[in-house]
């Protein structure tokens, strides 16, 4: 029997979930003492590194289950599940910081900027480079990329740029009326795009047929142990649960680092972006190396769009219900 198909294989593949559960138990029992005094930089660094590594490990396993679902369901649903699952982690972390920490009005905006810069410049550029070095020339569906950019640009303009030019509130603060408008527009635009991607124009987001003489796309999921649809559909949210639980403690550490240690407030958004995007970056690079540039574009541009489409409504809704300002 294959060692990866039995109970032992399942246990081995879900060690991250076990590590997350153990961390939750330890934090629940000893958390009040461990997180009560963070004045020691070494102790603070240890706690931050521990939680960051555990949450990153869990995030990679979320991506693994999403990749298995992608193999079972096909495109564009596979990439859609991947991007929404991973970006949901980011939204949860932002919500945790906003609800548990001191008022940080620019956190959501800093995270949006970080994600857009990392994805549209770093991740996309890296995947194009490694794909070109291996295959010289790759193809993707331009209509799909244009559809992504056609929604990313207005959403970014509305959510990041427009509040700086309105006079209803000082600086970049979002007034209640503007917040309601941005929530409705973000949900509407993102919803229309999802309808285009999953219903009307699915072919725009699938890998084009390889031209005669070109290299065929490889199976990038060959090293995955794909089990049943129900198994991965259950384990994906279960693997996200420890991240949700630990995000409150991580929020406290980020808030302490931004305040007490004098770190810039934008650092919190950058760290959250790195934590969330690292697994997706690996998936995008694997797709490029497998000559599936369309999946790479779906992951990269889908991450940017999902970030804006989900973070803006979530952040502004929390701001409206809690009374905390958002810029």
Give the role of each language-model region.
Residues 1-327:
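Hydrophobic alpha-helical segments, chiefly the membrane-spanning helices
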